[in-house]
Amino acid sequence: MIKNREIEVAPPRRTIQFGGYTFVEPDLNFKAPIFSCCGSIRDPSCEEREEEYIDNGHDEEPPVEVNRIQESTSFDEPVSSPPRYRPSENPGPSSSSYEPGHYSFNEYQQFPSRPQKRLVDPPIVDLDEEPPIVDLDDSFDNFHVGSTSEEVVSGDIAPEEEEEEGHDSFDDFESVPAQPPSKNTLASLQKSDSEIALNQQRHDMHGRFRGFLQDDSEEFSDEVGLLGADMNKELYDTLKSKFGFNQFRHRQKQCILSTLMGHDTFVLMPTGAGKSLCYQLPAVILPGVTVVVSPLRSLIEDQKMKMKELGIGCEALTADLGAPAQEKIYAELGSGNPSIKLLYVTPEKISASGRLNSVFFDLHRRGLLARFVIDEAHCVSQWGHDFRPDYTKLSSLREKYANPPVPIIALTATATPKIVTDARDHLKMQNSKLFISSFVRDNLKYDLIPKAARSLINVVEKMKQLYPGKSGIVYCLSRKECETVQMMLTKAGLSAEVYHAGLNDNLRVSVQRSWIANKFDVICATIAFGMGIDKPDVRFVIHYSLPKSIEGYYQETGRAGRDGMPSYCLMLYSYHDSIRLRRMIEEGNTTTGVRSMHLNNVLQVVAYCENVSVCRRKMLVEHFGEVYDEQSCRNSKTPCDICERQRKNAEAIRLFDVSTDALSILKCLPRMQKATLKYISELYRGALIKKSQEQAMRLGHTKLPFYSKGQGMSEQDALRFVRKLVIEGYIHERLYSVPNQAAAVFAYAELTEAGRDLANGKKTAKVYLHIVTCERKRKNAGLIELSNMNIVSEAQALKERHMVKHGDVFTRCLQDLTHLITAVAESSGLSGPYSIVSREGIEQIAALLPRTNSDLLRIDSMTQIKVTKYGRLIMELLATYWKQVDEREEEEMRNQLDKLKSGEIVMGGFATLQSDPGFPSVPYMKPLGGGGGCRGRGKKRAFSGFSSGRATKKPRATAPSARGKTSGRGGAKPATSLKRNMYPATSM
């Protein structure tokens, strides 16, 4: 037992670099803490303190207290936990009897006694066979899919190695070593160039934000000078006495100083970084009432309870509050010196309640309206993943309370530069001070595996081993899916409950509080759950379905590991989930601009999932404008699955130039009406399924120029290639529905305007595809075919793209860079600039404008020695061009915002499907969104559309639903028997 009641972390000591090693200057006054055996009896003086802490990689102010001793810091070691109530009949091992051991993702075999075929690609219906039927109601909550086929097919994402039977891909993900390797081995003394580049003194932009967002923290670094000694002392005294903290963390101090000085303040911090303190502490110190606008009643209730526990006057005016309670709050607000320091309200309450606005006017007149706080400020922007119309009405707060102006604080954890700009414009706080914390969550491991029949069960078994008795979240797309997953988890031996909008308010609150109190393990929820939840020990977050946006995914995964301990974030990826999301978007009544934005968000998530080469942490972080060196992830204890594979084998992935084949497909696509992506990929490989072979030959599709060009690709590679054309914007999958069949949806490939321009020669472009070339089961013939394709370097591929996008910047930068390197060569007595960097290398630098050491190291002829020697000079020169590019992209971003507001952006739309010779005429087929069908209880008839030209089949009868007629689109009743998945897009 540690005798010290409070242990303070010593400031970091000075380090000395020598060669490839780092030495720490010893502390001559070091005193070892006193330890003694306590006979397993807990000393009451060593009570744990609940304090959230997140390691965000670049924080300037580490916490000054060690609040608790954690059980594990590695994915290899199971985390022990206190006993908890477990309603499940098959509870996991308790912490009392559990002996920590070493668990590796490679060592643990799932279900060793039951070998099974692994579904890399979940079987779904393809229009080459028969159209799918999907049943859903207005809210999409009663969606259900029929039994899956037993056919084993390949997925889209090529894993590092194909798994053998009985071995799930999840077992191949390596966990963090429990003990570091011996430092006496030669291997431990050798470092790669990229590792050295990461650890050397940095002159790049790693950990900094691009020019879109300018952090104002430096302006508020001197608290004594800004506040005065007395006010500053009161600030820290209140921090300790009311909130129990000794120091601020992240950007809290600067945000609070800005608020205390009366500035409008915009706070952009990740989940769990302590945003709430930025307005709660000023509310306690300064007189008056702080009005907090929050989107969820559950979130409001949680905050109110916390404040009252801390002895801070706090009330909430919500729709479910009784009249007597409301009268009491209004009376207190009207008193001469209200005891209420924080008043929580919803945006709907502000827009609907005249009495509340009258109270605000009265407080403002008396000088007691301290500030407005807009929590979850991303809800203001239509670009935000959780846009709420009532939030846009909050702009009136600036107009109504302008003399004197009432300060506004806006806070969010998930806002891209575009959302920040839009939100500031909406709230009329363009001149607000901006404070940004790093988006890097070093303790989270990001992972992705194909969504297959037993994927979730295998993952759950692994979580039970790694985190026995610990909490987790499984996010689902619909209410029905939540209930299905909850039953699966219960059967697997985990205690689980559901949380979605279909539950009444009391039940939702009860479920949430029970989960926070550790009365059950896993909560199966829609995205309605989690906002503002203060539970630091969530050990895993699993996305059973595709999230709606990158911002939403980051926010939802951010609910894991808020205590700073290693935690696991996994996505089960199926491409057809994107079609489900698109249907929900395209059925909605939105402007073309908003619809375009939401569709683009889904496409960004698909690109994240289809990616096999770029660090997932880098993709997430840079989505928010922060520059990140992926080598940091690769060297961490929690590398993402991409970096883990790269760490094992840096040559596992090769980049191929597939431009010629892509152009051939685009030219042929207009001749192939009703073609699905899967059918196109089969033609490209020359590997049509048996049922469609005859029709393809009859229609002449086997004579198309691109037929059988991709023989060297696996099925998943070919699918990724075709989907790449969708992601790049050359192909668009248009969704169609059938009158009288509200459940049926079809996705057919069509050329976009950019695709037509490329096919017609009006523009030129390159298309590249990353392929995993080290798979155990890849046939030799396939490797030979791949070897005949053009392999290019990452820098070469990016060079051509950037040269086109910023041609004038490239020209000027190339000239300046050549002059710089020539001068360096002359001063070093070298023959010329190309003795330092090759001509190709100089062009690549000018085109790519690398912002990190690792990016610079990828340049042709660049080595670690050169990065160390010349990196600072190169980065200093590039800084000017970084700024120019950022300014252009910021202007483009503002233009997009303007178009969004006017609805000028049009993506998709609903065109009439033209019949193709050789295909049966279907006069009653309508595009999705073109109107409903007949209402009533008549029998439904499934449309037998297809992509390969087979004859139509007889209509398939569906059993009547026990639920009766729905109130959904077209009044169609959901089918109860489905033998295939729902959409004609192949899933993972």
Curated annotation (Swiss-Prot):
**Main EC class the enzyme belongs to:** isomerase
Chain ranges of the Helicase ATP-binding domain: 256-433
**Catalyzed reactions:** Couples ATP hydrolysis with the unwinding of duplex DNA by translocating in the 3'-5' direction; ATP + H2O = ADP + phosphate + H(+)
GO: which molecular function terms?
Answer: 3'-5' DNA helicase activity; ATP binding; ATP hydrolysis activity; ATP-dependent activity, acting on DNA; DNA binding; enzyme binding; four-way junction helicase activity; metal ion binding
Per its UniProt record, what Pfam families does this chain match?
DEAD, Helicase_C, HRDC, RecQ_Zn_bind, RQC
What range(s) does the HRDC domain occupy? 807-888
Q: What Gene3D superfamilies does the record point to? A: HRDC domain (1.10.150.80), P-loop containing nucleotide triphosphate hydrolases (3.40.50.300), Winged helix-like DNA-binding domain superfamily/Winged helix DNA-binding domain (1.10.10.10)
Q: Where is the composition biased (Acidic residues)?
A: 158-174
Q: Which NCBIfam families would you find in this protein's record?
A: recQ_fam (TIGR00614)
Family, per the entry?
Answer: Belongs to the helicase family. RecQ subfamily.
Q: What is this protein called?
A: RecQ-like DNA helicase blm-1
Organism annotation: Caenorhabditis elegans
